């Protein structure tokens, strides 16, 4: 069994059947919804940092240096981590398509229609592109991490090539930061996220990029997927909606 613990925003702790801890997009200490602080985390073996936005990788460096965690990320994110003092040997830089293996886990980066911007301590600005991830776990589970992507038609191809069973899908945006404008939608609307989940052929579509599951976009995403399931029968993705601190276990125990 694989456990997915949700921290709010896009942070997940994945614990594999053999006890390996994989942290995705760690934004914890300044995250008001997080169920714990970085100091309370178990030892983290592997961190996947999809892009340089603060709400996706702010705590990556401190956790990696504490636990000697391996990090998989893009080039601009690597430069930010090096600037923060993270040892280079902990970082594996990659790009779309270049599969890498760390801690016995194969990770295939895929396209994410989103940018990645960082600023180093000397003021240097760097831009890159966000990484989506297909995570191949030892028990055969394949996880897709969307990484703030907008909808794009090649999600169908990602599904055909990789057959992910579980998807971590951005379905909304948190308008909770005073220094950002108020956005009318997330990178995907609830309908687009539901359509993407269907294109990917997911068994379970786990909603993310929020702090409270009472969010209207989250409810709409769940409703649309349930309507798809009623219309199409078996084969449509099952929505998984969690509050921060809750855990989804895959595969579900058969009744």
Model feature map: region roles:
Residues 4-6, 27-34, 90-93, 147-149, ...:
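Short gly/ser/thr-rich secondary-structure transition/capping motifs
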Residues 1-21, 27-32, 110-113, 227, ...:
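Zn-dependent metallo-beta-lactamase
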């Amino acid at each position: 069994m694989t456990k997915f613990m949700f921290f709010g925003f896009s942070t997940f702790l994945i614990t594999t059947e053999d006890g390996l801890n994989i942290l995705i997009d760690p934004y914890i200490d300044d995250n008001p919804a997080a169920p714990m602080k970085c100091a309370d985390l178990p030892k983290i073996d592997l961190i996947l940092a999809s892009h340089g936005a603060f709400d996706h990788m702010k705590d990556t460096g401190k956790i990696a240096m504490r636990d000697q965690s391996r990090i998989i990320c893009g080039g601009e994110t690597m430069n930010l981590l090096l600037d923060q003092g993270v040892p280079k040997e902990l970082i594996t830089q990659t790009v779309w398509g270049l599969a890498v293996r760390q801690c016995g886990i194969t990770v295939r980066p895929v396209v994410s229609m989103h940018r990645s911007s960082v600023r180093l301590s000397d003021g240097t600005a760097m831009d890159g592109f966000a990484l989506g991830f297909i995570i191949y776990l030892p028990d055969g589970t394949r996880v897709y991490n969307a990484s703030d992507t907008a909808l794009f038609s090649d999600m169908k191809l990602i599904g055909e090539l990789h057959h992910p069973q579980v998807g971590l899908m951005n379905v909304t945006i948190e308008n909770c930061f005073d220094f950002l404008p108020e956005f009318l939608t997330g990178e995907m609307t609830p309908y687009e996220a539901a359509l993407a989940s269907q294109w990917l052929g997911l068994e379970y579509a786990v909603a993310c990029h929020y702090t409270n599951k009472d969010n209207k976009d989250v409810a709409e995403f769940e409703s649309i997927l349930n309507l798809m399931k009623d219309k199409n029968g078996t084969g449509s993705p099952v929505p998984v909606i969690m509050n921060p601190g809750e855990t989804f276990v895959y595969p579900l125990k058969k009744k």
